[in-house]
Structure formats: structure tokens, C-alpha cells
Amino acid sequence: MQANIFVFAFLLLSVAVAAYGYQPECLEPSLYGCRGDEDATFGWTFDREDGGCRQGSYCTRFGQPKNYFRSERDCKKACGNA
């Protein structure tokens, strides 16, 4: 009986995670820009501390980070409008 309860709870949790749409890029560190006069690319990032999307930039020479979105709409679509 107890095993059935654990199986049911696991299945319920799995369905909830799948339905919510887990987005790992939203859990990555936010964009915080570059030092000095380095080339920067500007866009949008999800800020976990504030729980919302904000403008940010990254240093082009390091490559595009995972928590970068071209528009506020893309950011909100992936990470939610918290």
C-alpha cells in the first residue's frame, strides 16, 4: 500500500514538472556586462533575485551565455512573467 502511494506521488510530481515546462537557462546566472571598453552584446536576462526579466549585456569574446534572450518577450515566454 505504501509503495503505491510513493509511485503515485512520483508520477504526480513528474506530470507537474512536465506541465510547468522546466527551463534550465532561467536558472543560470544573470548577465552583468563587461569591464571597460570591451565589445558587449545587449539583450534580456532573467534575474532570479528579482524574479523577472531585465535588460543586460555580456562580453562578446566569452560567447553567448545560456541566460540571454533577444527580447523581453522571449525572456518572459521562457521564464515566466514573475
Swiss-Prot record:
Expressed in salivary glands. It comes from Ornithodoros kalahariensis (Tick). The keyword Cell division does not apply. Its main location: cytoplasm. A motif (Cell attachment site) lies at residues 35-37. It is found in: Cytoplasmic vesicle, Secretory vesicle; Secreted. Gene3D superfamilies: Pancreatic trypsin inhibitor Kunitz domain. InterPro entries: Kunitz_BPTI_sf. One of its GO terms (molecular function) is toxin activity. This is Savignygrin (+). Residues 1-21 form the signal peptide. Keywords: Cell adhesion impairing toxin, Cytoplasmic vesicle, Disulfide bond, Hemostasis impairing toxin, Platelet aggregation inhibiting toxin, Secreted, Signal, Toxin. The keyword Lipid biosynthesis does not apply. Tick salivary platelet aggregation inhibitor that plays an important part in the anti-hemostatic strategy of ticks. Inhibits platelet aggregation induced by ADP (IC(50)=130 nM), collagen, the thrombin receptor-activating peptide, and epinephrine, although platelets are activated and their shape changed. Binding to platelets is similar for resting and activated platelets (Kd=50-70 nM). Acts by specifically binding to platelet membrane glycoprotein IIb-IIIa (ITGA2B/ITGB3) in a divalent metal ion dependent manner.
